[in-house]
Amino acid sequence: MGKYFSKDKSKYMLYTVSHPMDGYYWIRHADRGSVPLAILMVILFAVSFSANRLLASFVVNDIDPRAVDSLYELMGVLAFYLILCVSNWSVTCLMNGEGRMKDIAIAVGYGTVPITVMMTVSTIISQVIADDEQAFYGLLLGAGIVYGLIMILIGIMQVHNYTLGKTLLTLFITFIALLLSLIHISEPTRH
């Protein structure tokens, strides 16, 4: 357990957030990442997502807190994470990707860190902003989401040793595979 959540692994995750190109390269080539730590980051993302929906001020949040089921959202985020990783691995196996399943899981998991941080900060800030300051909330949340998506893009690109164009094509096909998987899972079985 200590080797997965060691101080070095945690520091390297933060290094990857601040230096994504170099960080993701060494995750693939020197086995520096940690899958359990990446899964923990996805769980923390799910918690911050639910907390934002439950606790953000009424100024920025029009969701009825009684309608939020945090456990259901946690399971949904974890299922989406699993299906995304499997879909990407399946597509990249056919497109000569060099990444392993664990590398993909780490790349996506570490990519959620900036989103989690900014979502938590936005939730806290939402408690003290006025109606005409909603743009600051949106800016913080948007910056975290954009940086997180850029990190995931860079992570997939580095893990599979792809060009930007091939990475974008692969991610497009991955999302088609993900949608097909979700449709198949949600469709009732016919006898």
PLM region spans:
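Low-complexity, intrinsically disordered extramembrane tails and loops of integral membrane proteins
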Residues: 1-8, 187
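Selected alpha-helical membrane-embedding segments in polytopic membrane proteins
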Residues: 5-102
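A short structural micro-motif
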Residues: 45-46, 176-178
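Residue-level detector of conserved catalytic or cofactor/ligand-binding positions
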Residues: 180-191
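Structural signal for membrane-spanning alpha-helices in multi-pass inner-membrane proteins
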Residues: 49-53, 119, 182
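Selective recognition of hydrophobic, aromatic-rich stretches within alpha-helical transmembrane segments
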Residues: 66-90, 106-177
